[in-house]
């Protein structure tokens, strides 16, 4: 017969009471009223914050964007096909953030920082908010170091500095992405981390860019963030902020970074789609009223850090596509007013075989000249003005039948200057090579040559100087100035080489 001992029972009850944990978890929940087109309307979620992540019953994550009196408008980070009306939603208490680490270098990721290159997970111990405030005035210093693109037309006449924001703008198929990718290729060995953000691009175009980076050995210092044309609007809207968060991680670790947004007008279209579906009032070109803020808060994150913060930098190169050269459209004017200058690419120049098709007359760099090395300033100082005058003169010369000798000479010089600015894709030039090239053209050494011979001669001259006059490169790279000694070396070498070249061409 079982005997019940009262003291044992009382001990068990006492233990249970001591172990009882009165922990209460409060979850902010709501119910799905309506779902479709990447948008969900939620009843409840009374204490949700603007921009807070919410989780649906079947696992989809969304962002609370519209906080209205009787419901919450949520944009979905997925297709939302499994979300049902009446299912529950809970607030997570978190704002969108991504993991960050050095391990992201060389990888292709999506807007949520998940790898999409099939090479396994990326380990990261830290995380950063996707949207973090831009550095304040005290945290910055003025731009003073050059970011060399390797493109002679840009580095000589529209220079970009580390920490600058320079817009690349032009019609479709004018080589905008090529300018940006060449800039990334030229950062090899320059200790610059590059982030390329593809927003709403064709998957084949992104694959082509990644292949170029891999072939040229640029992936080891590059991160590619890609949300292709078939991605949900929410992810296309988030992708640039994800790229900026990754670049900021390196900037605040005293590194130099360069970020390319290709292109923010696609992000604006995704944001317009989300806003219209959330029934926000449309404005000009049906964009919402805060589309300027969409881009300004993104591009203001590019900065040159102060010496107290380690002098890291983040250079932004947004790419904007225009429709038949119309730069007065809404998004182009917005981005032009936010950035520190713009590089215009012209379809007419591109079709005329001038590539990169940079329209030097209307391209500007508002702060880059402070970053240009002294040697380049000395040599290329007058080039931009000369080319602008040449373009004007060329237009005038079409109507004039007989031109005087001085005008003919100026036209011939201008044609040769324009010829030396032509450059094939993925063939960046060092600063020293650029200085030699411009000096040769600006001082009339190319005048005896036919226009078709210019490119061939310049290649020959650069090769000769590298092998026979290595001290020239050493002088420019060590002093950063174009000294009398450097000029004397060139004055000696160029006429010799021209004579030799002309003899070779005759035989």
Swiss-Prot record:
Reactions accelerated catalytically: ATP + H2O + 4 H(+)(in) = ADP + phosphate + 5 H(+)(out)
Membrane topology, as annotated: Peripheral membrane protein
Record keywords, A-Z: ATP synthesis, ATP-binding, CF(1), Chloroplast, Hydrogen ion transport, Ion transport, Membrane, Nucleotide-binding, Plastid, Thylakoid, Translocase, Transport
GO cellular component terms given for this protein: chloroplast thylakoid membrane; proton-transporting ATP synthase complex
GO molecular function, one term: proton-transporting ATP synthase activity, rotational mechanism
EC main group: translocase
One Pfam family named in its UniProt record: ATP-synt_ab_C
Site description Required for activity, residues in chain: 363
Listed EC numbers: 7.1.2.2
Residues reported to bind ATP: 170-177
Subcellular location, record wording: Plastid, Chloroplast thylakoid membrane
Subunit description: F-type ATPases have 2 components, CF(1) - the catalytic core - and CF(0) - the membrane proton channel. CF(1) has five subunits: alpha(3), beta(3), gamma(1), delta(1), epsilon(1). CF(0) has four main subunits: a, b, b' and c.
Reported function: Produces ATP from ADP in the presence of a proton gradient across the membrane. The alpha chain is a regulatory subunit.
Family classification: Belongs to the ATPase alpha/beta chains family.
The protein's name in its UniProt record: ATP synthase subunit alpha, chloroplastic
Species name: Liriodendron tulipifera (Tuliptree)
């Amino acid at each position: 017969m079982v005997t019940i001992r009262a003291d044992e029972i009382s001990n068990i009850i006492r233990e249970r009471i001591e172990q009882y944990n009165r922990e209460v978890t409060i979850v902010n929940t709501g119910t799905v009223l309506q779902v479709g087109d990447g948008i969900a309307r939620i009843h409840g979620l009374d204490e949700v914050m603007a921009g807070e992540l919410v989780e649906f019953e079947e696992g989809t994550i969304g962002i609370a964007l519209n906080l209205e009196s009787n419901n919450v408008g949520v944009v979905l980070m997925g297709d939302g096909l499994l979300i049902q009306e009446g299912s529950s939603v809970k607030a997570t208490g978190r704002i969108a953030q991504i993991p960050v680490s050095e391990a992201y270098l060389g990888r292709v990721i999506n807007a949520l920082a998940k790898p999409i290159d099939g090479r396994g997970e990326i380990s990261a111990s830290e995380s950063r908010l996707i949207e973090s405030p831009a550095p304040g005035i005290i945290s910055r210093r003025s731009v003073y170091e050059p970011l060399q693109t390797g493109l002679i037309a840009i580095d000589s006449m529209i220079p970009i500095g580390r920490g600058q924001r320079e817009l690349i703008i032009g019609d479709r198929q004018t080589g905008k992405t090529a300018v940006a990718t060449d800039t990334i290729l030229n950062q090899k060995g320059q200790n610059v981390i590059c982030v390329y953000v593809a927003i709403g691009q064709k998957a084949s175009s992104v694959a082509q860019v990644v292949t170029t980076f891999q072939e040229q050995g640029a992936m080891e210092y590059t991160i590619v963030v890609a949300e292709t044309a078939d991605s949900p609007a929410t992810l296309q809207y988030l992708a640039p902020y994800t790229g900026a968060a990754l670049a900021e991680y390196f900037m605040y670790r005293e590194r130099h970074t360069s970020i390319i947004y290709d292109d923010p007008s696609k992000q604006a279209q995704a944001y317009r789609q989300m806003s219209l579906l959330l029934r926000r009032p449309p404005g000009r070109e049906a964009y919402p009223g805060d589309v300027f803020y969409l881009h300004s808060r993104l591009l203001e994150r590019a900065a040159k850090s102060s010496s107290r913060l380690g002098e890291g930098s983040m250079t932004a190169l947004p790419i904007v596509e225009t429709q038949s050269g119309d730069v007065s459209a809404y998004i182009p004017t917005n981005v032009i007013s936010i950035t520190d200058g713009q590089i215009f690419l012209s379809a007419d120049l591109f079709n005329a075989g001038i590539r990169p098709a940079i329209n030097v007359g209307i391209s500007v760099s508002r702060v880059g000249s402070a970053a240009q090395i002294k040697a380049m300033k000395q040599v290329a100082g007058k080039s931009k003005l000369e080319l602008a005058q040449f373009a004007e003169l060329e237009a005038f010369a079409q109507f004039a039948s007989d031109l005087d000798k001085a005008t003919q000479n100026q036209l011939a010089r201008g044609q040769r200057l324009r010829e030396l600015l032509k450059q094939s894709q993925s063939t960046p030039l060092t600063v020293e090579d650029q200085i030699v090239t411009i000096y040769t053209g600006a001082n009339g050494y190319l005048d005896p040559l036919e226009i078709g011979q210019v490119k061939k001669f310049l290649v020959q001259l650069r090769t000769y100087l590298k092998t026979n006059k290595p001290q020239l490169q050493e002088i420019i790279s060590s002093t950063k100035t174009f000294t009398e000694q450097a000029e004397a070396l060139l004055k000696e070498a160029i006429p010799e080489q021209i004579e030799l070249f002309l003899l070779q061409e005759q035989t």
